[in-house]
């Protein structure tokens, strides 16, 4: 609660209170996440849209999703409460790759790549990664200031890659990194996931491993006129800056 949910909720409450106090803010773009949309019991092969909410997230089963959906609810309730509110849009990125600006950025979405390039994991696990480039996320935020619907909800997702695909791409483009080649069998990954990452519990593994989920980002393409860097390009273009930052 204190580490994940409270910072998101209290921080968002502070932001909207500051907007009201200032009285001069005309446009507000709230950075949310696909985690605010993805329910716990999604179906393999399902495509999700912004019509869905992660309202089944709890502190026990999905604290990050709870943090994101709670913060967005605060924003939307505030926005609908009375006249004179600024224009408001929410942006929902998936896993964000692309060149990092500082070492702290390697602790988030790029930890997936960092684990590969530093060979923190000897074998690969059978998992799909939904990807968007950080530069596209930034562009979507700028466009949402003046484009799209007031109160709009926009997914920013360029595509997806299997973890094994990502590792293969890195081996092809940066052979000196010697990223892992072999995948661990599903059943072993299912029961021994914490050996690869302490965050991989049995329930999480059962929900995500060897399953695919897709996202409909066409509203952002249509209403924000977005086009996307390919997932592969985002992977490849992430690495040089990671090397420059001294993490590889």
Locate the predicted segments by residue.
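Active-site loop of classical SDR/Rossmann-like NAD(P)-dependent oxidoreductases
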Residues: 163, 204-217, 235
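Conserved Rossmann-fold NAD(P)-dependent oxidoreductase catalytic core, especially the SDR/UDP-sugar
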Residues: 2-62, 89
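Active-site Tyr-X1-5-Lys
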Residues: 21, 58-89
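A conserved pocket-lining segment of Rossmann-fold NAD(P)-dependent short-chain dehydrogenase/reductase
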Residues: 1, 55-61, 102-103, 110-132, ...
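Conserved sequence/active-site signature of Rossmann-fold short-chain dehydrogenase/reductase
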Residues: 36-37, 96-98, 137
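Glycine/proline-rich active-site loop of Rossmann-fold NAD(P)-dependent oxidoreductases
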Residues: 82-86, 98-111, 144-154
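Mid/C-terminal beta-alpha module of Rossmann-like enzyme folds, strongest
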Residues: 140-201, 222, 231-248
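Conserved cofactor-binding/catalytic machinery of classical short-chain dehydrogenase/reductase
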Residues: 11-14, 70-71, 133-136
């Amino acid at each position: 609660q204190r580490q994940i949910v409270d910072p998101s909720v209290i921080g968002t409450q502070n932001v909207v209170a500051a907007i009201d106090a200032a009285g001069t803010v005309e446009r507000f773009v709230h950075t949310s996440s696909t985690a605010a949309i993805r329910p716990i019991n999604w179906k393999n092969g399902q495509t999700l849209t912004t019509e869905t909410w992660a309202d089944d997230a709890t502190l026990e089963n999905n604290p990050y999703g709870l943090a994101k959906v709670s913060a967005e609810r605060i924003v939307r309730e505030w926005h609908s409460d009375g006249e004179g509110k600024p224009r408001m849009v929410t942006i929902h990125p998936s896993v964000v790759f692309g060149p990092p600006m500082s070492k702290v950025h390697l602790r988030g979405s790029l930890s997936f790549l960092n684990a590969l390039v530093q060979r923190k994991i000897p074998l690969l696990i059978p998992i799909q990664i939904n990807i968007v480039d950080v530069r596209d996320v930034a562009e979507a935020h700028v466009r949402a200031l003046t484009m799209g619907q007031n109160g709009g909800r926009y997914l920013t997702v360029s595509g997806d890659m299997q973890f094994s695909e990502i590792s293969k791409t890195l081996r092809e483009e940066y052979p000196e990194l010697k990223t892992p080649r072999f995948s661990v069998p599903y059943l072993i990954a299912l029961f021994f996931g914490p050996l690869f990452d302490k965050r991989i519990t049995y329930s999480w593994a059962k929900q995500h491993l060897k399953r695919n989920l897709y996202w409909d980002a066409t509203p952002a393409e249509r209403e924000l006129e977005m086009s996307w860097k390919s997932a592969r390009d985002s992977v490849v273009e992430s690495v040089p800056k990671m090397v420059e930052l001294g993490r590889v």
